[in-house]
């Protein structure tokens, strides 16, 4: 795997979200897809449905879903008969999500956006599937750019840790 600067990757993810118009999941995946030989169009397509907490349903934060997608490349479990690989993959996903939860209090989009109290697991009706317009007001009231940066840093640190242990 080629070397990379984690700060550049974090800033790239934030920029892709804020200036590029990509959703939170896409921004995290597109910050690292090249390390795994995946082209941008494929990466953006794979991650496209996870924005807004999965299709704007405000469930698992899209940036956490982005880390989960990348976990499949970091610790692949492509053969369902190899239980050890699945266990390692799930452990990595739990580690990444746990670190995000520790830093932010939740991995649930509606809680992170302040739509429901943290830890309440209250149901909120699904919003329109139409994405919000990316205006200055949109960015002012949403923590998403910051959360994208946090996820990009968490997964980047894990990639560097694994590369350094080779």
Protein language model regions, located:
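Glycine/serine-rich anion-binding loops at beta->alpha junctions
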Residues: 22, 50-69
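Phosphate-handling active-site elements
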Residues: 35-45, 73-92, 163
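Structural signal for hydrophobic packing residues in well-ordered secondary-structure cores
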Residues: 17, 21, 32, 36, ...
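Polybasic, low-complexity association/targeting segments
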Residues: 1-19
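Contiguous domain-boundary segments centered on the initiation and propagation of an alpha-helix
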Residues: 14, 20, 39-43
């Amino acid at each position: 795997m080629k070397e990379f600067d984690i700060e550049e990757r974090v800033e790239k993810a934030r920029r892709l979200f804020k200036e590029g118009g990509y959703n939170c999941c896409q921004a995290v995946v597109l910050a690292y897809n090249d390390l795994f030989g995946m082209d941008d169009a494929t990466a953006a397509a794979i991650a496209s449905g996870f924005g807004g907490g999965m299709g704007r349903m405000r469930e698992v934060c899209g940036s956490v879903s982005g880390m989960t997608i990348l976990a499949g490349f970091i610790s692949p479990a492509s053969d369902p008969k190899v239980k050890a690989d699945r266990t390692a993959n799930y452990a990595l996903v739990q580690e990444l999500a746990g670190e995000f939860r520790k830093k932010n209090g939740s991995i649930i989009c509606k809680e992170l956006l302040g739509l429901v109290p943290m830890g309440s697991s209250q149901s909120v009706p699904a919003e329109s599937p139409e994405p919000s317009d990316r205006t200055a007001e949109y960015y002012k009231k949403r923590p998403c750019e910051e959360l994208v940066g946090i996820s990009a840093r968490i997964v980047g640190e894990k990639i560097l840790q694994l590369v350094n242990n080779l």
